[in-house]
């Protein structure tokens, strides 16, 4: 759960945090008894607790398909991310990965920690995949094939232009959006709109660009070789080499570059909102909406923040818990996007080279949210000043003592 100091500063986080903790514990206790499914869900909890919690919203059949889809793509991503694998060995694996998912004898040892376990015991994922309905299998195979080919292409070339950046993000994340839409269709839960491919792609690009921005330092410090996803067309305006952005003497230029990257990501929000409006199934809606809200929140935190080049920048755990707890309808999504766009807007320096473009995109988002006519009576994500009075702090400490005693007893 969050630290005691943070919870005392943000007491409104406590109840959602407790609910999230109990939900995680419940999900961990519901591991299927079959060895292959047990491995898949246990691994899902290890590689992404937040995703494993959100996926619980789905019905069993669709949940199983999405779980396998996620782990297959995580395994593919593990191969791509392992910079110790020689290119002439990595590229054929990426290109052929969609065939390996049918082979319960196949595995390839790479990655570290839980990802190495995933790769070493990939036969469990293959066994689960082979139990899915044909429609799910075909969707997963197609997306894995296209993604592997795209990853292989960018192993051999750098991200030079913004078009390259969009193409790379399409391969590694936009295709995830398309694949999920195909799984929803195969489940009979959703009807695809005429522009479903474009807006599904935008859902993936918005999440991926947020991750690429947030993970700059981790990627640039990767050993034995840096991972570089920021397009030269953007960073080349501010530095001679991408790694120069992490040095303190370049902070002003680095932050300007960061702000342009965030501004680029904002262009996908209109499509994301359009996609979420089209969803009919409440569980699928929550599954899709929660990560999108966390992405706009992360961008608001990263914007104009030099800490992106110094360490880890992420939403506090209590705010994540609030997003999971509160996101139930499209009105909640509009409220969250409005709040976080307002937060981001207050951080825009009018002397920033891209200030005008940033403000225009934020104002367009705010107008979309206002025009929906559902912003009244919402609980704000950003107006909490985090300054509880001393009496309240004492009450919270007593409450926490009782809660922790209860949790230990159970």
UniProtKB/Swiss-Prot annotation:
- Source domain of life is Eukaryota
Q: What is the protein name for this chain? A: Squalene synthase 1
Q: Which residues, renumbered to this chain, carry the PTM N-acetylglycine?
A: 2
What pathway annotation does it carry?
A: Terpene metabolism; lanosterol biosynthesis; lanosterol from farnesyl diphosphate: step 1/3
Q: Give the GO cellular component terms, alphabetically.
A: endoplasmic reticulum; endoplasmic reticulum membrane; plasma membrane
Q: Where in the cell is it found?
A: Endoplasmic reticulum membrane
Enzyme Commission numbers on file: 2.5.1.21
| Protein keywords | Acetylation, Endoplasmic reticulum, Isoprene biosynthesis, Magnesium, Membrane, Multifunctional enzyme, NADP, Transferase, Transmembrane, Transmembrane helix
Organism, as annotated: Arabidopsis thaliana
MF terms from GO for this chain are: squalene synthase [NAD(P)H] activity
Q: Which family does it belong to?
A: Belongs to the phytoene/squalene synthase family.
Q: How is this protein positioned relative to the membrane? A: Multi-pass membrane protein
One GO biological process term: isoprenoid biosynthetic process
CDD domains on file: Trans_IPPS_HH (cd00683)
Tissue specificity, please? Expressed in all tissues analyzed (seedlings, cotyledons, inflorescences, siliques, leaves, stems and roots). Highly expressed in roots and pollen.
């Amino acid at each position: 759960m969050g630290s005691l100091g943070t919870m005392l500063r943000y007491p409104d986080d406590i109840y959602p945090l407790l609910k999230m903790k109990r939900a995680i514990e419940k999900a961990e206790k519901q591991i299927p008894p079959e060895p292959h499914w047990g491995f898949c869900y246990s691994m899902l909890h290890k590689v992404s607790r937040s995703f494993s919690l959100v996926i619980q919203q789905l019905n069993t059949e669709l949940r199983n398909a999405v779980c396998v889809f996620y782990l297959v793509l995580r395994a593919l991503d593990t191969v791509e991310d392992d910079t110790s694998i020689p290119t002439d060995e990595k590229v054929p694996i990426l290109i052929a990965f969609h065939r390996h998912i049918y082979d319960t004898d196949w595995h390839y040892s790479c990655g570290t920690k839980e990802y190495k376990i995933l790769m070493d015991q990939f036969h469990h994922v293959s066994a689960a995949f082979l139990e899915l309905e044909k429609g799910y299998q075909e969707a997963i195979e197609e997306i894995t094939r296209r993604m592997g080919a795209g990853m292989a292409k960018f192993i051999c070339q750098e991200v030079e232009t913004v078009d390259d950046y969009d193409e790379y993000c399409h391969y590694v994340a936009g295709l995830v959006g398309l694949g999920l839409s195909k799984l929803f269709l195969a489940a009979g839960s959703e009807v695809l709109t005429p522009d479903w491919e474009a807006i599904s792609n935008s859902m993936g690009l918005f999440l991926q660009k947020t991750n690429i921005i947030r993970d700059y330092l981790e990627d640039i410090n990767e050993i034995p070789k840096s991972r570089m996803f920021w397009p030269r067309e953007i960073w080349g305006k501010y530095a001679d080499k991408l790694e120069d952005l992490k040095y303190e003497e370049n902070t002003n230029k680095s932050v300007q570059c960061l702000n342009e990257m965030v501004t680029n990501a904002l262009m996908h929000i209109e499509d994301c909102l359009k996609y979420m409006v089209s969803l009919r199934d409440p569980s699928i809606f929550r599954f899709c909406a929660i990560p999108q809200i966390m992405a706009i929140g992360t961008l608001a935190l990263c914007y104009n923040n030099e800490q992106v080049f110094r360490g880890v920048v992420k939403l506090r755990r209590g705010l994540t818990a609030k997003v999971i707890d509160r996101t139930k309808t499209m009105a909640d999504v509009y409220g969250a996007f409005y709040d976080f766009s307002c937060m981001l807007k207050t951080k825009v320096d009018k002397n920033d080279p891209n200030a005008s473009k940033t403000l225009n995109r934020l104002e367009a988002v705010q107008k979309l949210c206002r025009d929906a006519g559902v912003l009244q009576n919402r609980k704000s994500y950003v107006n909490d000043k985090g300054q509880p009075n001393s009496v309240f702090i004492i009450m919270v400490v007593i409450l926490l003592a009782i809660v922790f005693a209860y949790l230990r007893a159970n």
